[in-house]
Amino acid sequence: MPFISETASAIKRRFGFNDRPAPSESLRSVPCTPEANTVSRDNHTHQSLLFSSAVRSMPELDEDGAICAGSAQISRSQSFEFNEDPAFWKDHNVQVIIRTRPLSSSEISVQGNNKCVRQDNGQAITWIGNPESRFTFDLVADENVSQEQMFKVAGVPMVENVVAGYNSCMFAYGQTGSGKTHTMLGDIEGGTRRHSVNCGMTPRVFEYLFSRIQKEKEVRKEEKLHFTCRCSFLEIYNEQILDLLDPSSYNLQLREDHKKGIHVENLKEIEVSSARDVIQQLMQGAANRKVAATNMNRASSRSHSVFTCIIESKWVSQGVTHHRFARLNLVDLAGSERQKSSGAEGERLKEATNINKSLSTLGLVIMNLVSVSNGKSVHVPYRDSKLTFLLQDSLGGNSKTIIIANISPSSSCSLETLSTLKFAQRAKLIKNNAIVNEDASGDVIAMRLQIQQLKKEVTRLRGMGGVDNQDMDTISMGCPASPMSLKWDGFNGSFTPLTTHKRMSKVKDYEVALVGAFRREREKDVALQALTAENEASMKLEKKREDEIRGLKMMLKLRDSAIKSLQGVTSGKIPVEAHLQKEKGDLMKEIEVLRAQVDRNQEVTKFATENLRLKEEIRRLKSQGEEGERDILNQQIQALQAKLLEALDWKLMHESDSSMVKEDGNISNMFCSNQNQESKKLSSIQDENEFLRMQAIQNRAEMESLQKSLSFSLDEKERLQKLVDNLSNELEGKIRSSGMVGDDDQMEVKTMVQAIACVSQREAEAHETAIKLSKENDDLRQKIKVLIEDNNKLIELYEQVAEENSSRAWGKIETDSSSNNADAQNSAEIALEVEKSAAEEQKKMIGNLENQLTEMHDENEKLMSLYENAMKEKDELKRLLSSPDQKKPIEANSDTEMELCNISSEKSTEDLNSAKLKLELAQEKLSISAKTIGVFSSLEENILDIIKLSKESKETEEKVKEHQSELGSIKTVSDQTNARKEVAEKKLAALRCSLSNFASSAVYFQQREERARAHVNSFSGYLNQKNEELDVIRSHKREIDAAMGKIQQSEAELKSNIVMLKIKVDEENKRHEEEGVLCTIDNILRTGKATDLLKSQEEKTKLQSEMKLSREKLASVRKEVDDMTKKSLKLEKEIKTMETEIEKSSKTRTESEMELENTIQEKQTIQEMEEQGMSEIQNMIIEIHQLVFESDLRKEEAMIIREELIAEELRAKDVHTNMIERVENALKTLENQNNSVSGKIEEEVENVLSLVHEASRLLEVSH
């Protein structure tokens, strides 16, 4: 990967943004080193252009180092106040600052001084776009703000928070080239000098931090304040953590536990003591950081860097040791970038993808944190990215965070600037919970005991003050560490047997023993708490396992739903686009579940190792508790028992001394004052004895409690050991059971990842075509809009014509209705309103009539009762009149009674006649009243008819409403069917268009297939040719190897012959020497042996000549062997080269075959999609016909319902007219009677009653 040179000048080019001397004398040059002045600047280096003169309101440098006067002038004219708020951090934990960089000379040359943002004040900024967007933040820094001002506003409060014990974090966010690295690091080499204006936030922060630490040490000398600072520097490159201070480390892992929190394992931490040490570490880490050149930034950061400093402080105050610690994170994020703008390719594109992924995860985390701060329960995906996981405490946790959002005012970066402003606006709503990280520890129990003892000592000394005043010869000395005292008696010279030093040592021993016991008990409590915490962790692990099971169940449900949706797609119930979208969502959910399972599996292994470690720790603690601590406790118990015995012995001895003093006092009787002193002395000794006794009892109780706590802790350890063993066994079983599932899930994840990679590759290929077709799409959209408007106008005209035709048809049917449908509807509505008002009036009238009817019914009942009474009286009168006729025979029989009653009978006849006349009058009057009552009955019949007609009118109204609602529902259904028909027509057009595209793509894939086949055939031919050549070479090599074998065999034979000849020659030489010696001794006797010697000499010469020939042959054979070996080596090399070529060609052939298979598969998929499209077109055509049929059916139903509605309206009108006639008749009858009928009937009935009473009275008189 091409990186920029890591020399000092390169670091300056990267982070320095050094100020350069301007040619104009009006502006004062910034002092800097010669090295910084000699560094050359490039016009495309955005960072160097960004903050090249922080002192001069950040004006622009061009290629020659000249200041861009226009930009400087504009920036000066638009400057605002930039000051800190001292009370901000009291109520807030997150601060968001916007920083704008100046325009570069290249941007000014292209677009002038136009900007995409406008600063309104020190807290508000407006994005100039369509539409304008105004944003409000804590602070807004324009291009006039220098590094020093930025540090005073953001860096100084952060250092104060760190010194106060708060975790703090500062990170810069923005697109690439917006000035993040300059803001955070700046000129690092310049930071080593005190007056460098271009050094960034990090060196300034640490310079101020160490000066602040030095001031704290000077102010708090008495408290023995001690600071330690440890620094680490890491980067996150392609989602891998690298240690910038140790380049050999690679792919470090993030860990989380309850002690250290979130930390990087095996990360190098260096202790620093000054700002120079920190700058040195920064320079070392910056030299190892990944940077590369893009179109937008020559020195673009390709990774996120996190510089962490842990500050710890300790001091002692009033016997209590305070420990305060804080973590400071300074983060330089890599900038988000577009492939189109940055021109990233290859490795740069991969880096940009990982950067954008982590930044998008950061944005998602901030969005979910905002939702959480608003009270919603949303999962915050910290673990989706290593950056967010590392900054978990800084985002929504225990930290005070400063976010510096760097933006570019260039119009070409307006969309990126808007995205950064929206990100900062969301981040402003995060709520952190920052607390002071401080711990205080000390011997609180020992201090309490000492305070009690000192109080007792003070009270005792106050009580002894009177004795000291009475006798100056007695000196009393109080010991601060013990309630006992050392007294010197001037007369008898007696003193306590235990000296002050011994008492103090005893008390200290007691205190140390007690403190040790309490500390051990506290450690036991801490150990028990840790074990309970581990138990809770194991329970959480079990819950996570249950969550995994739920996730698997959810995956099964998703699979079932996917199968159902596929069945629906095959059956044609569900469209393909909806199915694909749903399948994509299900796959994303499944991937999330699988990711969570993978994370949980890692956690399971981590917890398993943690459990093993805890087992070992518990075993070790148990062995220590069983072996070492018991011995220590036994020793302490024995020491306490010895001290208790010593105190009791001293008490007994002191009591004997006091008895001896008493005897001496009784014998002498000379020192009265000594007796008083002795009594005081005895009282003090008794107090001391009482104190010792209480202390012994307390020690014994403490020993018993310690023994109990020891036994309880051992039992608890055994119980927890068993619990941990059980949990570990369960965990191992679950891990084994989940092993197969995890493997299957991993395979599924791999396949899904491969599928996603294929899809992303296709999207990348389609991206190029999409860019080309975007303009054509815009033109087509405009044309479609025009066509849609024309279509809407035609539809409106068609609807108007249809309404006019329908109104005309209804005009022929209805005689009274108007010509068009709209007027008919209006008249119908008016008629309905009139009918409603008439119905309300009718209801009122009916109510009044009903009230009158009830009154008439009451009166009628009264009259009927009177009539019945009158009829009863009439019957009685008739019966009375008939009774004298029946009594006449009886009276005639009695002569005496007839004589007496002749006169009375005459009178009675007269009375009877008058009574008959009155009764006849009453009967006539009753007949008249019966006629009047008949009028009431007719009126009642009219009212009943009116009620029936009102019910009928209500029923007709309800029917009319039902028909109207049916008509409205049919209209809505028809509208829906029309809309569905339009959608179906659009889909049909889209399908036809897509089918045409599929046809063109099928042709394209056919061509690709032909090319791939030709490629495969060419490679296969080439491969066959190479294989044939390789076979020829191998056969040639085999022949050479066979020849070499023969030659080697002949060489071996020659070697063996030479050896044999050498042996023979040696034998002949030996024999010749022996025979030569014998010939010199006796030449005469052994003449035959001389001839033999000559023969042997000849044989020797023959052998030597043969040996020479064989050696020559051997030399020639060796030459041939060497030639053969060279040829074989050459052939082997050729074979190897041929094999490598064959392997390469075979790989390329396999790749081409794979490409061919992919093209064939894609072609098949396109054909399948084309077939599906044809089937869908057929289905759409059928659906359109069905919709047309339904719309026609709905129109006919609407026509029928309208006819029924008209008939019901006519019927309602008839009923209404009949009801009105009946009501008018009833009213007329009531008016004619003029409400006097009831009065007349009452008068007539009263007259009848009076007549009946008179008749009855006459009858009584006649009797």
Curated annotation (Swiss-Prot):
Residues 35-44 have a biased composition (Polar residues). PROSITE patterns: KINESIN_MOTOR_1, KINESIN_MOTOR_2. InterPro entries: KIF15/KIN-12, Kinesin_motor_CS, Kinesin_motor_dom, Kinesin_motor_dom_sf, P-loop_NTPase. GO terms for biological process: microtubule-based movement; spindle assembly. Keywords: ATP-binding, Coiled coil, Microtubule, Motor protein, Nucleotide-binding. The lineage of its organism: Eukaryota, Viridiplantae, Streptophyta, Embryophyta, Tracheophyta. One of its GO terms (cellular component) is phragmoplast. This is Kinesin-like protein KIN-12E. SUPFAM superfamilies: P-loop containing nucleoside triphosphate hydrolases (SSF52540). Residues 21-44 are annotated as: Disordered. The keyword S-adenosyl-L-methionine does not apply. It comes from Arabidopsis thaliana (Mouse-ear cress). Pfam families: Kinesin. Belongs to the TRAFAC class myosin-kinesin ATPase superfamily. Kinesin family. KIN-12 subfamily. Residues 679-737, 764-805, 831-881, 905-966, 1091-1168, 1193-1251 form a coiled coil. ATP binds at G174, Q175, T176, G177, S178, G179, K180, T181. One of its GO terms (molecular function) is microtubule binding. Residues 93-430 form the Kinesin motor domain.
